[in-house]
Regions:
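Twin-arginine (Tat) signal peptide motif
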Residues: 1-7, 364, 431-437
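N-terminal binding-site loop/beta-alpha segment at the start of enzyme catalytic domains
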Residues: 2-132, 192, 198
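Conserved, mostly hydrophobic/aromatic
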Residues: 56, 68, 105, 120, ...
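Conserved beta-strand positions in the central sheet of alpha/beta enzyme cores
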Residues: 67, 104-106, 166-169, 206, ...
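Short, acidic/polar
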Residues: 83-97, 145-159, 213-220, 296-299
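Active-site groove signature of glycoside hydrolases
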Residues: 160-179
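Beta/alpha (TIM)-barrel catalytic core signal, keyed to glycine-rich beta->alpha loops juxtaposed to Asp/Glu
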Residues: 173-410, 439, 444, 449
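Ferredoxin-like iron-sulfur electron-transfer modules
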Residues: 341-363, 408-433, 452-453, 458-468
């Protein structure tokens, strides 16, 4: 789908919303405790109106356009110093979200060191089962035997304390047809899941995709055989036509799914948080257009505007994240053609920044050598966005020119913040290039190369610390 086609679509969506009020709450079959419109202006600071819903074409049910991604719950320590999910925080966020119309919750057996499903299930089970939809996955990455896959599938029912899963996904397919067949076809799991769908224990069957355009098109050919109920893709205004690495541009994926009438679930609307932490110059431009709105809200409006989008997932760790997204989607104000044109230019600009395309999913973790891989990338990207490009001035002169002074400030800021943000035992210089992490990265980042690049930058800055 070309940008001009999206502009036409967004313009039409905005016009229809204005004429009919479809951007507000919907009346029938909404899983929000029976309320037509969930939430209003009040303690969460929403501007007014209820949550925007999309209609699931299979059962005609209403799904909140804001979906809760359960991969980023707040962590704490137990009495033995082990990382565990802060259950009290999860309960509070789930209660708040449900009360304000969010009814789609997405998890996986591998999220948060395998703790996400149980913590999410405990929080949700305190509410009526018909007030929310559960989405989870068959995440059989390392052991795709039928025995292990069946155990993982059965465990999800136990973790969520339920007799049915509303949305079930084959997790992160797209590396190769061989990988897809090994994980799901040859072991008989896909045939089994199709029967589970017929029996009603799975209500919607789909998959999440990470891969290139060729693989996307190949897998989509299976729709005639398997009749996918939905497909989850990475979509945001940066990846619409500027996807990195092996990933397919979102405009192509969305366009092909829309043609076939397959509902789309959106992941990474903020691109791992990077679209909430933009270069200062771009932040100024966004604030000039809409001073009262958050930087993140632009990305969420982009992801939610297309009408074939069923829900947009957001991993909301803290209450302020949830409240900001509720303001954006209660109700959603679709992008205008002018908005889309502007974000297209922002994306063009962002594609020129030397960022590492890490989304912070942590699939690469833990590193056997203790490196905080996402932390190293996040710090580097943050410094680039804030203008600390730490490019050494041309020439060998030690003269204190303005350019040299700027370099000294940037160098010091980078080094000080690096040591504060990343423990020394977790820094990039510990990478030996074993490559264990690479096969797990859905963005296909050459992780050792990027870590070595960051380490080289750090060492270069430290070597020059006595010169200036």
């Amino acid at each position: 789908m070309e940008r001009r086609d999206f502009i036409k679509m967004t313009g039409a969506a905005a016009a229809v919303a204005a004429a009919t009020g479809i951007a507000g709450g919907c009346a029938s079959k909404v899983k929000n405790g029976g309320n037509d419109k969930a939430g209003s202006a009040g303690d969460n600071g929403m501007a007014g109106g209820g949550m925007t819903y999309r209609t699931d074409p299979k059962f005609g049910e209403k799904v909140s356009v804001l979906g809760y991604g359960c991969m980023r719950w707040q962590m704490t320590k137990d009495e033995n110093g082990k990382d565990i999910i802060d259950q009290e925080s999860v309960n509070e966020l789930v209660d708040y979200a449900l009360a304000r119309g969010v009814n789609y919750f997405d998890s996986s057996p591998v999220y948060l060191q395998g703790q996400s499903e149980a913590a999410s299930g405990l929080a949700l089970s305190r509410h009526p089962r018909d007030s929310y939809y559960i989405a989870t996955k068959l995440s059989n990455f390392s052991d795709w035997s039928r025995e292990n896959s069946m155990l993982m599938y059965r465990k999800s029912f136990e973790n969520f304390r339920t007799d049915h899963l509303d949305y079930y996904l084959l997790h992160s397919i797209g590396r190769s047809i061989e990988d897809f067949e090994n994980r799901y076809v040859k072991n008989g799991m896909l045939d089994f899941l199709l029967k589970e769908r017929e029996a009603g224990r799975i209500r919607h069957l789909g998959y999440s995709f990470h891969g290139n355009r060729q693989m996307f098109d190949e897998l989509l050919k299976t729709h005639g055989k398997y009749h996918w109920d939905f497909i989850q893709i990475q979509m945001n205004y940066r990846d619409w036509s500027h996807a990195d690495g092996r990933n397919c541009n979102a405009d192509h994926m969305y366009g092909e799914l829309e043609k076939r009438g397959i509902p789309v679930v959106i992941m990474e609307p903020l691109r791992g948080g990077s679209l909430a932490k933009l270069p200062n110059r771009i932040v100024d431009e966004l604030k000039e257009r809409m001073p009262s709105e958050s930087v993140a809200s632009w990305a969420f409006r982009f992801a939610g505007t297309p009408e074939n989008v069923l829900t947009v997932l957001s991993g909301m760790t803290y209450m302020e994240h949830l409240q900001d997204n509720l303001r954006t989607y209660s109700p959603l104000v679709p992008l205008t053609a002018d908005d889309m044109e502007f974000l297209g230019k922002v994306a063009d600009s962002l594609s020129k920044y030397p960022l590492v395309p890490c989304t912070g999913c942590q699939y690469c973790m833990p590193c056997p050598y203790g490196i905080d891989i996402p932390g190293n990338f996040s710090h580097y990207n943050k410094c680039v966005n804030e203008g600390y490009t730490v490019s050494e001035p041309d020439g060998d002169s030690d003269e204190c020119t303005e350019e040299m002074k700027a370099y000294r400030r940037a160098r010091r800021a980078y080094l000080v913040s690096y040591d504060r943000s990343i423990e020394k035992i977790c820094q990039a210089n510990r990478c030996i290039g074993c490559g264990q992490c690479m096969s797990h990265c859905p963005q296909d980042i050459n992780i050792p190369h990027e870590l070595h690049r960051i380490d080289h930058l750090i060492e270069s800055l430290r070597r020059h610390s006595d010169r200036f």
